[in-house]
Amino acid sequence: MASGAVGQEIDKLVGTWKLVSASSKTSKGEQGEAPYGLSPAGFLTYTAEGRVTALISYGGRKALSGTGGTVEEQAEAFKTFLAYAGRYTLAGDKVTHTIEVSSIQNYVDRNLVRSIQFQDDRLLLITPPTLVNGKIQTVELIWQRLQASA
């Protein structure tokens, strides 16, 4: 593992986290739209080797009809699930995910920078302010550390 203060933060980060909530706020402090629907689910894994994997399923997803579903159902399934993997670096209170593979090809080779806060066994990731539907917003994702199975 890494040494020093950064090493201690990486040690706190390493593991698997389950998504607890996702919310957004406008630059005026108003509640924004639910970024992943009302009851999203997801997992986030950081390894000691500097790898990250993220999976987020929007709330309210419907099962496909039949074996593979209709074209419309497939499009909706794609729109409501995000998956990516790559490398991460930690610098101060920021974590950067460098995307190597993603369900959204446009994310590949992008850096996603998030402010990071630890609160007991919870991890808060906050996006930089971004223009969404004509309003500047930040998204806050709260993750709960999963304990190792006995």
Name the predicted role of every residue range:
Residues 2-150:
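Lipid interaction determinants
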